[in-house]
Design a protein with these regions (language model features):
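An acidic, Gly/Ser/Thr/Pro-rich helix-cap/linker signature
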Residues: 21-104
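Secretory-pathway/luminal and periplasmic proteins that interact with or process carbohydrate-rich
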Residues: 119-127, 143, 172-175, 190-202, ...
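Short, functionally critical alpha-helical segments immediately adjacent to catalytic or ligand/cofactor-binding
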Residues: 106-122, 182-187, 276-280
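Primarily a LysM-type cell-wall glycan-binding module
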Residues: 243-270
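Substrate-binding/active-site groove segments that recognize
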Residues: 128-149, 162-165, 193-196
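Extracellular LysM carbohydrate-binding repeats and other cell-envelope/extracellular binding modules
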Residues: 279-309
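Bacterial Sec-dependent N-terminal signal peptides
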Residues: 1-29
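LysM (lysin motif) carbohydrate-binding repeats in extracellular/periplasmic proteins that recognize
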Residues: 261-290
């Protein structure tokens, strides 16, 4: 029997077995079975929600079997989807990272939440009609002053939706005072999480999830995010990393005088209309919203344009 008392050693063992079955669709064994086959003895620990991001960073959160299962899912059964999401993240993270850098009281790790929410697709649409990188439903978008009319849907706007997400996350944290509940509320709604908490006083997020007090999606939301953060933090050690392209995107925020069309902008900047739409997916048609005197767009800089072309 292999006895492991160091949390980081536990993590490395978990990754070894996860990577072993990554992308192998013919291996139907569950992650816990693979671990059991290796006869690894993991020390027990009580998870608290005192500092979610610290527990991810120092890997103590690995003691949660829910997190272990989600690492297995992302590096095993959903391996192709995970690779795609991390590939997309390279394209859009530079655009949202700058916004988070201005928010000193928000954990920087939150820039990776769109991997969970949308697979980092700014045009993603859920079954509940939530849209964009940050997956806002229309009611929440309206509360956050994101416009949706015949010209734009700002839920798909990379910068504006990110600024709205920052406001929303700050609000949720101010309500719940810890990130497990704030993240659960981002998924299930603040009212829903308050209701579950009021019916089960004194229980933390992990206890509520373990006791099936949350609906399944909300119970899995925090473990899934933790798993993705761990993968991201150790990305170079994964089999995902060699599959990612070397492209690095940098952007300019350009101000356009209206009236203007995407066709006009394409000619002015020497970038295809397709690429303009890719970085400004909020635009519904060819016409820039005419009710603004000027309008800001996200355009790759000259070096990025050269790589794209």
């Amino acid at each position: 029997m292999i006895k492991i008392n160091n949390v980081k050693d536990v993590f490395l063992c978990l990754l070894f077995f996860a990577f072993h079955c990554a992308g192998q669709s013919n291996d139907s064994r569950k992650f816990e079975d693979i671990i059991s086959d290796a006869v690894i003895e993991v020390p027990s620990a009580e998870l608290t929600d005192s500092d979610f991001f610290k527990s991810v960073d120092d890997l103590t959160i690995i003691h949660s079997y829910q997190v272990q299962e989600q690492i297995d899912w992302y590096l095993g059964y959903d391996y192709a989807g995970t690779v795609t999401a991390f590939e997309r993240s390279q394209k859009y993270i530079p655009a949202i990272e700058n916004i988070f850098e201005q928010e000193k009281d928000l954990p920087s790790e939150l820039i990776y939440l769109p991997i969970l929410e949308s697979g980092f697709s700014p045009v993603a649409v859920s079954k509940s009609n939530a849209k964009g990188l940050w997956q806002f439903v229309s009611v929440t978008a309206e509360e956050l002053d994101l416009m949706d009319d015949s010209y734009v849907d700002e839920r798909n706007d990379i910068r504006k939706s990110t600024k709205a997400a920052v406001r929303h996350l700050k609000y949720l944290y101010s309500v719940f005072k810890n990130w497990e509940f704030a993240l659960a509320a981002y998924n299930g709604g603040a009212g829903y999480v308050r209701s579950v908490m009021s019916k089960n006083p004194g229980m933390n997020y992990w206890q509520l999830a373990e006791a099936n007090k949350f609906k399944r999606e909300t119970a899995l939301y925090v473990p899934r995010f933790a798993a993705l953060l761990i993968i991201q933090k150790h990305l170079k050690s994964t089999t995902i990393y060699p599959k990612l392209s070397d492209l690095k995107y940098n952007y300019m925020k350009v101000t356009i005088e209206t009236p203007a069309t995407i066709s006009d902008i394409s000619k002015s900047f020497g970038i295809s209309e397709k690429k303009i739409r890719e970085f400004n997916p909020q635009l519904k048609g060819n016409v820039i919203p005419p009710y603004y005197k000027t309008y800001s767009l996200l355009i790759p800089n000259s070096e990025s344009i050269a790589m794209l072309n």
